[in-house]
């Protein structure tokens, strides 16, 4: 009966460990920083286009 809590704790620990498959990356995976940089570039382009056509938004 004393082994039951130990067994339950081990099961919980095993379930919380990330699997090996979750950490493997495919060829087309990009780091998160590049997505952030792309979003910033898109925002800057939209702002520059807006300011080019409409002076009020600058």
Curated annotation (Swiss-Prot):
Q: Which residues form the propeptide?
A: 23-46
Tissue specificity, in the record's words, reads: Expressed by the venom duct.
Annotated keywords = Cleavage on pair of basic residues, Disulfide bond, Secreted, Signal, Toxin
Q: What molecular function does GO assign, one term?
A: toxin activity
Cell location: Secreted
Task: Describe the PTM.
Answer: 5 disulfide bonds are present in each homodimer: two intrachain disulfide bonds per subunit, and one interchain disulfide bond linking the two subunits.
Q: Which domain of life is it from?
A: Eukaryota
Please state the span of the N-terminal signal peptide per the UniProt entry. 1-22
Under the cellular component aspect of Gene Ontology, which terms does the record hold? Answer: extracellular region
Say which family it is in.
Belongs to the conotoxin T superfamily.
What does the annotation say about its assembly with partners? Homodimer; disulfide-linked.
**Domain topic, free-text comment:** The cysteine framework is V (CC-CC).
Protein name from the UniProt record: Conotoxin TxXIIIA
Q: Which species does the entry assign this protein to?
A: Conus textile
Traced from the root, the source organism's taxonomic lineage reads: Eukaryota, Metazoa, Spiralia, Lophotrochozoa, Mollusca
């Amino acid at each position: 009966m004393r082994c039951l809590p130990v067994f339950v704790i081990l099961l919980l620990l095993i379930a919380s460990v990330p699997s090996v498959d979750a950490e493997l990356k495919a060829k087309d995976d990009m780091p998160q920083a590049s997505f952030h940089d792309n979003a910033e570039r898109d925002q800057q382009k939209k702002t520059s286009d807006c300011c080019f056509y409409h002076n009020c938004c600058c």
